[in-house]
């Protein structure tokens, strides 16, 4: 193969890697991560997300859902670069409809809640705004529907609660409601969090 030949540029690298990268081949994943030019969003060209567009995040979260196939070093690199990518793009827009359709996407959003307060607040604002825009008053009912679920988990730190909620097909909706309701509760308790420029 031509895997040993260095590509001419980032776009060429993205198109070449996209066709031959296998999630099951740790060596290819490590090669992709090590040889990606810029540290940041460009790395995800390797993972069929060459624009770092938010609509393709479920493809990245699919990789995270199979992270046990990675070595520890590769997994940590993916986490670090993914976080840097989201911070660079200010999480642009989380696609609310993808939360309803893609289980790995929901898993990813739950994991994002563990990435520090800045990221958590950005995710919360984005989900809350779209929830209200799409569902209106129904969005406020979600906190009522999940209040019994949240009480036992309230003793856990928010990061632990989000980390535990890796959804399966039958409870994806449950964890999504928990994430949205938790976002509403936190937003209500803080009233107006400090705005960071």
From Swiss-Prot:
GO terms for biological process: intracellular calcium ion homeostasis. Residues 1-20 are annotated as: Disordered. InterPro entries: Stanniocalcin. Keywords: Disulfide bond, Hormone, Secreted. GO terms for cellular component: extracellular space. It is found in: Secreted. GO terms for molecular function: hormone activity. Belongs to the stanniocalcin family. Has an anti-hypocalcemic action on calcium and phosphate homeostasis. Homodimer; disulfide-linked. This is Stanniocalcin-2. It comes from Cavia porcellus. The gene is STC2.
């Amino acid at each position: 193969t031509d895997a040993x030949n260095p590509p001419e540029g980032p776009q060429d690298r993205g198109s070449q890697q996209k066709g031959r990268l296998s999630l099951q081949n740790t060596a290819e994943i490590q090669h992709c991560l090590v040889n990606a030019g810029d540290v940041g969003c460009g790395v995800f060209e390797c993972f069929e997300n060459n624009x770092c567009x938010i609509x393709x995040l479920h493809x990245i979260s699919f990789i995270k859902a199979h992270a046990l196939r990675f070595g520890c070093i590769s997994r940590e690199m993916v986490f670090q670069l993914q976080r840097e990518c989201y911070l660079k793009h200010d999480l642009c827009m989380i696609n609310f409809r993808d939360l309803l359709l893609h289980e790995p996407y929901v898993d990813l959003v739950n994991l994002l809640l563990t990435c520090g307060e800045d990221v958590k607040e950005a995710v919360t604002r984005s989900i809350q705004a779209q929830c209200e825009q799409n569902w209106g008053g129904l969005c406020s009912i979600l906190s009522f529907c999940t209040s019994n679920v949240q009480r036992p988990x309230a003793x856990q730190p928010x990061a632990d609660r989000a980390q535990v909620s890796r959804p399966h097909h039958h409870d994806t909706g449950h964890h999504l409601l928990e994430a949205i309701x938790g976002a509403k509760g936190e937003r209500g308790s803080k009233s107006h969090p400090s705005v960071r420029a």
